[in-house]
């Protein structure tokens, strides 16, 4: 782990000023936004769709509810939630990055998903919504990019209704030694090459690999959610722990 102080944080394996991280992450996603969906399919061999489907199946979202898809990017989860909540419900796709938000908006409008879906540029650490507003919040592959994760979790807790749930889908720690070694080799040697060939940006995908290693492991994130106020916090390891889905409730 990289040593940190309250004034510094990690950006991949680098130590940077905490105030600078959001801008550096923004540069990464401005760079890859146009190829984001294609790269997700290529680098996960399409398995990210199964991870997201499992998240949706675990959400418990029903007709008429209000859902926040945080760090929603190009809108894979928001599109499904829009259909699930129906005309009387509401889905907000929020992302701090305007390039990702623009592509998500265009993609979903081209799919004919309008009416109950709104778009908000927002920082997860200071969500611009009232207290007790959402029935469900999801954040998929976004929490590791947040500078102050504890602050972001508290912000999510604040805007979640009593009885509501948070689902955090994120890269995590493989549970088997052989899988971990193979995953490291793929992440650090093959993934940046794919990024260079397809998105013309190997550095951003090298950051991706590093940011995954710096993200809290399954048990640590579970404890962070509990510290933010969430109860009955559990997680499921997916694909041997390469990804984990954490769930917590506000009572």
Curated annotation (Swiss-Prot):
Q: Where are its TM segments located? A: none
Q: Which domain of life is it from?
A: Bacteria
Reported EC number(s) for this entry are 2.1.1.163, 2.1.1.201
* A GO term for molecular function: demethylmenaquinone methyltransferase activity
Q: Which reaction does it catalyse?
A: a 2-demethylmenaquinol + S-adenosyl-L-methionine = a menaquinol + S-adenosyl-L-homocysteine + H(+); a 2-methoxy-6-(all-trans-polyprenyl)benzene-1,4-diol + S-adenosyl-L-methionine = a 5-methoxy-2-methyl-3-(all-trans-polyprenyl)benzene-1,4-diol + S-adenosyl-L-homocysteine + H(+)
Q: In which pathway does it act?
A: Quinol/quinone metabolism; menaquinone biosynthesis; menaquinol from 1,4-dihydroxy-2-naphthoate: step 2/2; Cofactor biosynthesis; ubiquinone biosynthesis
Reply yes or no: does the keyword Nucleotide-binding apply. Answer: no
Q: Which cysteines are joined by disulfide bonds?
A: none
Is Lipid metabolism found in the keyword set? Answer: no
Q: What keywords were assigned to this record?
A: Menaquinone biosynthesis, Methyltransferase, S-adenosyl-L-methionine, Transferase, Ubiquinone biosynthesis
Q: Which InterPro entries match?
A: SAM-dependent_MTases_sf, UbiE/COQ5_MeTrFase, UbiE/COQ5_MeTrFase_CS
Q: Which GO terms describe its biological process?
A: aerobic respiration; menaquinone biosynthetic process; methylation
Query: What is the uppermost EC class here?
Result: transferase
Residues at which S-adenosyl-L-methionine binds: 74, 95, 123-124
Extract the HAMAP family matched here: MenG_UbiE_methyltr
Q: What does this protein do?
A: Methyltransferase required for the conversion of demethylmenaquinol (DMKH2) to menaquinol (MKH2) and the conversion of 2-polyprenyl-6-methoxy-1,4-benzoquinol (DDMQH2) to 2-polyprenyl-3-methyl-6-methoxy-1,4-benzoquinol (DMQH2).
Q: Which family does it belong to?
A: Belongs to the class I-like SAM-binding methyltransferase superfamily. MenG/UbiE family.
Report the protein name in the record.
Ubiquinone/menaquinone biosynthesis C-methyltransferase UbiE
Species name: Edwardsiella ictaluri (strain 93-146)
């Amino acid at each position: 782990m990289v040593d940190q102080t309250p004034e510094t944080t990690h950006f991949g394996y680098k130590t940077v000023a905490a105030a600078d991280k959001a801008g550096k992450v923004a540069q990464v996603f401005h760079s890859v936004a146009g190829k984001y969906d294609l790269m997700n399919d290529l680098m996960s061999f399409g398995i990210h769709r199964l991870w997201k489907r499992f998240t949706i199946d675990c959400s418990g979202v029903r007709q008429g509810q209000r859902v926040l898809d945080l760090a929603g990017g190009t809108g894979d989860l928001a599109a499904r939630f829009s259909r699930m909540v129906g005309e009387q419900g509401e889905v907000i796709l929020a992302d701090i990055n305007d390039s990702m938000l623009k592509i998500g908006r265009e993609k979903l409008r081209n799919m004919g998903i309008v009416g109950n879906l709104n778009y908000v540029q927002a920082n997860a650490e200071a969500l611009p919504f009232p207290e007790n507003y959402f029935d469900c919040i999801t954040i998929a592959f976004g929490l590791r990019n947040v500078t102050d994760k504890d602050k972001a979790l508290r912000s999510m807790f604040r805007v979640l209704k009593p009885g509501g749930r948070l689902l955090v889908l994120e890269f995590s720690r493989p549970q088997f030694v052989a899988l971990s070694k193979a995953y490291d080799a793929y992440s650090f040697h093959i993934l940046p090459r794919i990024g260079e060939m397809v998105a013309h940006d190997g550095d951003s995908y090298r950051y991706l690999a590093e940011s995954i290693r710096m993200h809290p492991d399954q048990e640590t994130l579970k404890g962070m959610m509990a510290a933010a106020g969430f109860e009955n916090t559990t997680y499921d390891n997916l694909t041997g722990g390469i990804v984990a889905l954490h769930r917590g409730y506000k009572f």
